[in-house]
Amino acid sequence: TKGVFEMKTGQITAPIIAYETWGELNKARENCVLIFTGLSPSAHAASSPKDPSAGWWEDMLGPGKPIDTKQYFVVCVNSLGSCFGSTGPASINPDTKNHYRLSFPVLSIEDVADSGVAVLDSLGIERVNTVIGASMGGMTALSFSLRHPTRVRRLVSISSGSKSQPYSIALRSLQREMIRSDPVWASGNY
């Protein structure tokens, strides 16, 4: 995207938001299905002529499948902060010419949802037929629907909730501490 992308805890300049598409956008521009990924997948949800390798949702997305690319124009957005092409801590900050590292703003689900809006804007799509997500992607789809209700017709949230449960929060905290306790972590600046 161009310009400054405002986030819950800061901002980044001209972020790259990676995404993949399948199918054709109709003339009315009303057949878009927007998919948000879970925590670890890339935007490569299914194979395509550009990339024939199998995607993580290969059985769900494609011609004649539940998300039918003969009927829908599908956009799968790669989350900000991930290592699959979107701007994140390993990216170069265009303002400083150095890696963001720990200066990258702490991400929120709302930030990821808003990055989906930026992708839709770049494609000239005002409203999606359906927004879909599983796990963290389901939380993102819910956030997208709440923050931008005029931009979505339907919501499908799979294996998700409106907030993280205490067990999940504790597990993620333990995972962060494991990384921080690594002797070569160097406070994240490596």
Question: Where do the model's predicted regions map?
Answer:
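Ligand-binding pocket scaffold of soluble enzyme catalytic domains
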Residues: 1-190
